């Protein structure tokens, strides 16, 4: 019965048995009644012991049975019976390159009936099957996107919500959980929810450069769309004073042409001019570029919204081998 749709034990058992699990709206309290509601007798006649006994003279009603079995005359499509328990998977596509997408994310995409996300990221998720439904929306409609995903999953769909990078880093996992937290809907609560990690832009850029995040570091978004700029300034000041390596997301946009230089002014109060800086643009995508510079030479003209900026700590250093490219790393020791 549908009232038991949220029971994890049923989902686990179905997976272990590799059998479809379907639920049906019914008030029946025994297995035979549920079977009657799910599968018309014309398709699968059955004989139930408790009901057969009910037709014979007796003074007490038959006891309900926990199991009932129907044997159909022909194969029955399980997808046509009742509803499935919906599943919502929030997954990270990684920075963009196909070989940097995790196997778990790829499996979740392959299993999904519906793909939900910002149009650019839905395109990144491809190639997709013709039978998969695509639900694309604007990049700023995160909560609406999350609610739509829950509505689809509540109807028994297998929904993949896609983000670039890691879904838990300035991406859709928080929006999905916020939507669930603010909802009073038993159907949403019954949805099977999963979050699949991905390679974040900061980690992809760091790996391309070497190991600039090899010691303590923090990630800060410079976008003030969802938080006041004063909060951002305070966090930059404390993180820079504590000598964290800093990875800046969303450094510059047309609507925010000056905040990045203001952020650098704060960092420069705590870091030496020769502090190593890594600039990674579109890492993991076609046309990717990587550059190293110093805090003194860095300016807003060198970056855009697609640039990951990593400002090293006081111990971050550059090393070159045989005149080749520089590698950047932050030592694990601290002295």
Placement of each model-derived feature along the sequence:
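Class I SAM-dependent methyltransferase SAM-binding "motif I" and its flanking Rossmann-like core
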Residues: 169-245
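Class I S-adenosyl-L-methionine
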Residues: 2-33, 39, 76-79, 83-98, ...
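General beta-strand structural signal in soluble alpha/beta enzymes
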Residues: 22-25, 54-55, 60, 71, ...
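Short beta-strand segments
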Residues: 61, 70-72, 91-92, 161-164, ...
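A contiguous loop/helix-start segment that scaffolds small-molecule binding in enzyme catalytic cores
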Residues: 28-29, 88-90, 158-159, 241-335
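C-terminal edge-of-domain segments
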Residues: 40-77, 303-322
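Internal, active-site/partner-interface "lid" segment
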Residues: 32-35, 51-65, 211-260
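Short glycine-rich anion-binding loops that position phosphate/pyrophosphate groups of nucleotides
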Residues: 57-58, 62-66, 72-77, 95-98, ...
């Amino acid at each position: 019965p549908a009232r038991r749709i949220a029971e994890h034990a049923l989902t686990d058992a179905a997976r272990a048995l590799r059998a479809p699990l379907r639920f049906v709206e019914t008030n029946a309290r025994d297995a035979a009644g549920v079977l009657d509601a799910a599968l018309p007798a014309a398709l699968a006649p059955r004989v139930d012991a408790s009901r057969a006994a009910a037709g014979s003279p007796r003074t007490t009603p038959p006891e309900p049975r926990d199991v009932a079995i129907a044997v159909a005359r022909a194969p029955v499509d399980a997808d046509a019976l009742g509803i499935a328990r919906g599943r919502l998977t929030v997954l990270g596509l990684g920075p963009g390159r196909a070989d940097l997408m995790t196997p778990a994310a790829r499996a979740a995409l392959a299993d999904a009936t519906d793909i939900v996300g910002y149009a650019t990221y839905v395109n990144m998720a491809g190639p997709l099957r013709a039978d998969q439904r695509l639900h694309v929306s604007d990049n700023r409609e995160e909560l609406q996107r999350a609610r739509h995903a829950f509505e689809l999953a509540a109807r028994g769909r297998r929904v993949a919500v896609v983000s670039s990078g890691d879904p838990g880093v300035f991406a859709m996992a928080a929006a999905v959980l916020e939507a669930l937290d603010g909802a009073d809907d038993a159907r949403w609560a019954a949805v099977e929810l999963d979050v699949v990690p991905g390679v974040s832009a900061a980690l992809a850029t760091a790996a391309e450069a070497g190991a600039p995040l090899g010691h303590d570091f923090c990630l800060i978004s410079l976008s003030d769309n969802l938080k006041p700029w004063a909060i951002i300034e305070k966090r930059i000041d404390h993180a820079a004073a504590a000598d964290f390596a800093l990875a800046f997301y969303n450094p510059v946009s047309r609507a925010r042409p000056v905040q990045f230089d203001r952020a650098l002014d704060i960092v420069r109060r705590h870091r030496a001019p020769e502090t190593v800086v890594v600039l990674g643009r579109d890492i993991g995508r076609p046309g990717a570029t990587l550059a190293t510079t110093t805090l003194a030479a860095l300016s807003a003209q060198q970056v855009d919204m697609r640039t990951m900026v990593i400002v090293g700590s006081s111990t971050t250093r550059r090393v070159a081998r045989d005149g080749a490219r520089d590698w950047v790393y932050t030592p694990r020791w601290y002295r």
